């Protein structure tokens, strides 16, 4: 049986943080911004294609599917940017606005990567595999409901949620690719 860990990608999160922070501070500075969403799409697509290459040859990867998932996040980013414009306009006199913008960019990066990760798992990985094991970061910031899931194997069709689905979630999946009927039966017995 093949088991692949799709661990949380801190490098992708950092790239997203830099994108959101830069966007927020450009809005804050009052400069007219022309956001390059292609760089955002590239971050998302490179992330998920590199994950999919763990179990599939590059020539068999449907990049269009990755692009569709990235487009959802870009739409969400545009909504965030519009809301941010309004928020900054209403709060530009506050002393702690820069700190709030930085914190928002950090949360936004983690949340957007989690949303993208969730969509990648549900729309691409679940089509190739039946099962995944829930993993947490194992630190004090893991919420109790996710800690209770740590190490539990789920069937994609029966899982209430998947890693990354809830706001700020940093959990990740170990995906099972059983190769024989016996391996599937073994998972089902422990499921």
Regions found by a protein language model. Give the residues of each.
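N-terminal leader/targeting and assembly helices and adjacent pre-domain segments
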Residues: 1-120, 124-130, 177-191
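Betabetaalpha-Me/HNH-type nuclease active-site subdomain
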Residues: 153, 158-159
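Generic structural motif
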Residues: 137-139, 176-179
């Amino acid at each position: 049986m093949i088991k692949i860990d799709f661990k949380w990608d801190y490098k992708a999160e950092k790239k997203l943080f830099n994108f959101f922070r830069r966007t927020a501070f450009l809005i804050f500075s009052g400069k007219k911004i022309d956001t390059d969403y292609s760089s955002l799409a590239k971050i998302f697509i490179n992330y998920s294609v590199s994950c999919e290459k763990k179990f599939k040859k590059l020539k068999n990867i449907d990049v269009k599917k990755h692009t569709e998932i990235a487009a959802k996040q870009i739409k969400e980013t545009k909504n965030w940017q519009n809301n941010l414009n309004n928020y900054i306009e209403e709060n530009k006199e506050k002393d702690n606005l820069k700190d709030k913008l930085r914190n928002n960019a950090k949360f936004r990066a983690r949340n957007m990567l989690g949303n993208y990760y969730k969509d990648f798992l549900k729309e691409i990985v679940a089509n190739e595999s039946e099962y995944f094991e829930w993993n947490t970061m194992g630190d004090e910031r893991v919420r109790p409901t996710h800690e209770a899931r740590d190490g539990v194997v789920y069937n994609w069709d029966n899982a209430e949620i998947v890693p990354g689905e809830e706001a700020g979630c940093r959990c990740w999946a170990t995906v099972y690719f059983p190769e024989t009927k016996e391996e599937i039966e073994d998972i089902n017995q422990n499921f």
